[in-house]
């Protein structure tokens, strides 16, 4: 949340207030559990900004760390002049059924940790407090393909409702399991799926008069951080990976082995900011769009992953906060473009709720 434009702070606070009232109306104390970073200044500033938004709602917010070296309150200096205090987590109450800090027993626990490496023992068996999001939303069980399957359903229904081709808002994708890049197993599946997807994309390009070379993105089905990603324009490319490319694709966040991949239609990044390829990122709290920013990378092209060295963020005052179109202006005028981004973000959030509901049923 460090890239959220300050102009949208009131909207963010209102959205956070709405979310908290639904989850824990009597909440006074909230515990924020971040990722295990102490050196990533951008991430720590994000945690501080998120805590500030929550404090503006009237909550007492403290930050509990899972890091074993945090054994006492530890204050970190941030690059913007602020400080952030991390405190050691501890189990509270009879039988340790609650999670909190020394002299701090929260109503709710907000995870800003994606649980890529699994659920730590400290977070297990919490039956008396709200954990937001629930543990089964972590990347130890979550898969990108399940999210996009749910998004496909939502986008299809929405497109039928307003009379557009769902392909305009729903990129094609396929999945391959049983992959081992080091041992070169699963290459046949990967090659076939890349070939199939490129064929379908070419057909859609012809149908829509798009004069571009189609491409797909091969990415790890689990995990975040822009790891394990490659751009492919021909199926032969995935058969002829050199050792360096295989090593890059084989491991994701927390050093976990990549065994499942998603092959996703590549969408050319046509926007630029200060001569850099730029893609919009939309912030949401609860069901509200609260602003956004551009991820910019001057070292990457329109068909590449921008989450890579050379990346920077441009917090932009998205006109009207992505919530109001302007019918007097052209369809691609900034207020209307940002409104369209906000619509897709809300569809994606609805898809995430469906994905989460299904994971609860399956757990």
Residue spans of the language-model regions?
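Conserved catalytic alpha/beta cores of large enzymes that bind or transform nucleotide phosphates
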Residues: 20-36, 43, 309-363
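Conserved N-proximal alpha/beta basic substrate-recognition cap immediately N-terminal to
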Residues: 9-11, 15-18, 38-55, 62-212
